[in-house]
Amino acid sequence: MIITENQIWDRFNTVKPISIDAKWYEDVYSLELSIQLRFAIGERLGLLADKGWEVIKSLIEKHGFQRELIQAAGLCHQREAYDFLLKILREESIPKINTVRALSCWGAIIPTPDLKNILKEESIHMRLAGLNLLRFKSHLLNATEILELVEDLLDDFREEVVIEVIKILQRRDEEKIIKCISQIAIYGTDPTVETALIALGSIGTKESLIALSSLSRNLTNRTHKQMAYKQISHQYLNL
C-alpha cells in the first residue's frame, strides 16, 4: 500500500511522535518525499533514541548520507551514533557541515584535535558550528588550550566569527584571556571592539578593570572611549 505525503502529515498531526513505531518511519521514508517531510521524519526518529537509531542506521545504509538522516543521528543521543558521526567527520569525501552540526550535543567530549580541524576550515558555517562545539567544551580546557584553538579565528575578516569567539572568551577570567580581548578592543572593527569592551566589563575582575582603564586612556575613537568608561563604572559597582 502506497502512502501519500498528505497521509503522513495527517498522522503526524494526530498521533504523538513517540507513539509511532520506528519501523513505520522506515517504511514511509523515501527520497521522493519533500525535504520538509524528510526532515520531519528524521526529527521524529531522533526522539525515539535507541530504537530510532537502529532505523536511522538502516536508512543511511539504503540512501546514503542524507542531511536529515545525519541530523537524526545527532538527535537520538546514542553513543554509537556519536562514534558514527565522528568517523564520517574524519572522511574527507563527505561534506562536513551537517556532521558538525549533528555533533552539537557532544561538544564537551569531542576530541580536541577534531575540534581544531573544524575550526581551521575557512567556511563561516563550519567555524560557527565549531565554536558552538567549543562553547560546550571550553570549561574543560585551560586558557592556553582555548587560545590555541581560536588563534586563527581572531583574525577572521567576518565580524560574526570574532564576536562568537569573544563571547566564549568572556566566560573566563585568566590574565592571558583578558589580554587577548583587550587586543581586539584596540585593533578590531566597531562591532568587535564594542563586544570586546562589554566582555571585559562582564568579566568583572581587577585585571579586567585595569585593562579597561588602560583602554579608556589609549583608545582614539571617542565612542569606544565612552564605552570603556561605561564598563569601568559597571565594574566599580561589582568589585
Where in this protein do the model-derived segments appear?
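TPR/TPR-like (Sel1-like) alpha-helical repeat modules
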Residues: 214-220
